[in-house]
């Protein structure tokens, strides 16, 4: 099976065999790419991986970028002769998940992550933190009701915003920084973004725990979740592939596997 997770910053492809993700590939989200370009990229990588007896029989897509969804559907139908499954809010009902929010429309990536979390950690009150372009804190009851949320900028937006709104500050990369105080401009900005993001997430989690006043099983996913590998004092599980795992679980429910 081919899993396609289309985000605002990156597109993540997952190659899945027997319900196991054996390889993930990531490229930047560029709305002008064509189905032909995506096929060339995928075909080249899959051939290089030399996976024995791998044939794409199913494709499932999560997308928050409609302009990229269209060429991905074309890729699926034209090159693989497959009608892909496109995740939408109706799939919450199939997975016995209730969206108990005033705004019922969830991003498909959020829904997939929540499907993954409630499947992996059943009968628990959950706080699922999706750390992508935006950082979304999802509160889910042990009865599978999504009842609360907090949404903040992601680390990438924080760094990008500083660069866009200043004339002289340099562009930085998103990496772990061991200490907060530096004597060079570049490392001072890197440290500010990294430690500022860590402090923001920790502070919001602390406030959520105070307001909820109950045990929450905390799970982090998304590209920025790896920044918290050394900060697991309050995050129980860090799983960058949680969204894709949720897509696998949904696929299995839809096709009774």
Swiss-Prot record:
- List locations, semicolon-separated: Cytoplasm
List the active-site residues: 109
Arranged from A to Z, the UniProt key words for this protein are: ATP-binding, Coenzyme A biosynthesis, Cytoplasm, Kinase, Nucleotide-binding, Potassium, Transferase
Domain of life of the organism in this record?
Answer: Bacteria
Pfam families from the entry?
Pan_kinase
Q: Which cofactor does it need?
A: NH4(+); K(+)
Function, in words: Catalyzes the phosphorylation of pantothenate (Pan), the first step in CoA biosynthesis.
Task: Report quaternary structure and partners.
Answer: Homodimer.
Q: What is this protein called?
A: Type III pantothenate kinase
Species of the source: Ehrlichia ruminantium (strain Welgevonden)
**What lineage does the source organism belong to?**
Bacteria, Pseudomonadati, Pseudomonadota, Alphaproteobacteria, Rickettsiales
């Amino acid at each position: 099976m081919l899993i396609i997770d289309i985000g605002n910053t990156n597109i993540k492809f997952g190659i899945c065999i027997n319900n196991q993700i054996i390889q993930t590939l990531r490229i930047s989200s560029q709305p002008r790419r064509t189905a032909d370009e995506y096929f060339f990229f995928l075909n080249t990588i899959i051939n290089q991986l030399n996976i024995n007896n791998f044939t794409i029989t199913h494709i499932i897509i999560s997308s928050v970028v409609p302009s990229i969804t269209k060429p991905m559907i074309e890729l699926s139908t034209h090159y693989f002769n497959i009608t892909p499954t496109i995740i939408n809010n109706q799939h919450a009902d199939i997975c016995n998940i209730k969206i108990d929010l005033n705004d019922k429309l969830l991003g498909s990536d959020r829904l997939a992550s929540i499907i993954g979390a409630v499947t992996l950690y059943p009968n628990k009150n959950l706080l699922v933190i999706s750390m992508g372009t935006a950082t979304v804190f999802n509160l889910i009851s042990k009865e599978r009701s999504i009842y609360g949320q907090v949404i903040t900028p992601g680390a990438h937006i924080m760094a990008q915003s500083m660069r866009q709104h200043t004339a002289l500050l340099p562009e930085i990369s998103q990496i772990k920084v061991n200490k907060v105080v530096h004597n060079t401009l570049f490392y001072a900005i890197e440290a500010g973004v990294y430690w500022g993001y860590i402090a923001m997430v920790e502070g919001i989690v602390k406030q959520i725990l105070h307001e909820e006043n109950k045990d929450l099983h905390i799970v982090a996913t998304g590209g920025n979740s790896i920044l918290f590998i050394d900060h697991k004092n309050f995050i129980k599980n860090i799983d960058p592939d949680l969204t894709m795992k949720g897509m696998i679980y949904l696929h299995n429910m839809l096709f009774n596997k």
